[in-house]
């Protein structure tokens, strides 16, 4: 069962206060949230990854979008935001709800939602107005296509437990790679 609307609204309302007073220390706040999300993803594992080796798949993580130094901070935040938004969407489906232990899935979704709110506040602070910055459209598109490949894979595998395990491992990998990206941003500041 998907997260109830009232639970999501409660999370949004509670997050609103922190958004209004949040200073944008992207590497610090997002890195902490990223670590919590990784821990929750690790706890969500229900079957041995070794039993799913035949289902492994290369989803073509857009590494080059996270390697470049061409990003302004606001653009980098937008790419991270898109990755987390797509992850949130993926794990908010009814097929996802049927696969994972409900309380862990809710905690994971809440953590992703908080990260999205924090990143939105950072974009606003970086740009100085409540409009999204000009962003690297190609990078955002690359992230969207990456998640389309993941969704297509799940559909082709009929949302099997092994398919979800492969996807869970892939998302953990992408979060780990985004952490490296954030550390690079921190060094640039």
UniProtKB/Swiss-Prot annotation:
Q: Which SMART domains match?
A: IFabd
Cited CDD domains: IFab
Protein task: Produced by macrophages, IFN-alpha have antiviral activities. Interferon stimulates the production of two enzymes: a protein kinase and an oligoadenylate synthetase.
Q: What is this protein's name?
A: Interferon alpha-21
Q: Which family does it belong to?
A: Belongs to the alpha/beta interferon family.
Record key words, sorted: Antiviral defense, Cytokine, Disulfide bond, Secreted, Signal
The gene is IFNA21
> Which InterPro entries does this entry report, sorted A to Z?
4_helix_cytokine-like_core, Interferon_alpha/beta/delta
**Location in the cell:** Secreted
Which PROSITE patterns does the entry link to? INTERFERON_A_B_D
Example GO CC term: the record gives: extracellular space
Signal peptide range equals 1-23
Which Pfam families does UniProt cross-reference here?
A: Interferon (PF00143)
- Please give the coiled-coil regions recorded for this protein: none
Q: What GO terms in the biological process aspect are recorded for it? A: adaptive immune response; B cell activation involved in immune response; cellular response to virus; defense response to virus; humoral immune response; natural killer cell activation involved in immune response; response to exogenous dsRNA; T cell activation involved in immune response
Q: Specify where it is mainly localized.
A: secreted
* Annotated S-S bridges: 24-122, 52-162
Q: Name one GO molecular function term.
A: cytokine activity
TM segments? Answer: none
């Amino acid at each position: 069962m998907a997260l109830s609307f009232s639970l999501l609204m409660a999370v949004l309302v509670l997050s609103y206060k922190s958004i209004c007073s949040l200073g944008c220390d992207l590497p610090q706040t997002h890195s902490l949230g990223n670590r919590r999300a990784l821990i929750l993803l690790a706890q969500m594992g229900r079957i041995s990854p070794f039993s799913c080796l035949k289902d492994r798949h290369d989803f073509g993580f857009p590494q080059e979008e996270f390697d470049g130094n061409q990003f302004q901070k606001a653009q980098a935040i937008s790419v991270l935001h898109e990755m987390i938004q797509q992850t949130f969407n993926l794990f908010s489906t009814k097929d996802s709800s049927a696969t994972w232990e409900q309380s862990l899935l809710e905690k994971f979704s809440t953590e992703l939602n908080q990260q999205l709110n924090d990143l939105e506040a950072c974009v606003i602070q970086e740009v100085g107005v409540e409009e999204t910055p000009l962003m690297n459209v190609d990078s955002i598109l690359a992230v969207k296509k990456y998640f389309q490949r993941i969704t297509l894979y799940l559909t082709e595998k009929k949302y099997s437990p092994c398919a979800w395990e492969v996807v869970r491992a892939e998302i953990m990998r992408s979060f780990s790679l985004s952490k490296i990206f954030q550390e690079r941003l921190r060094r640039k500041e």
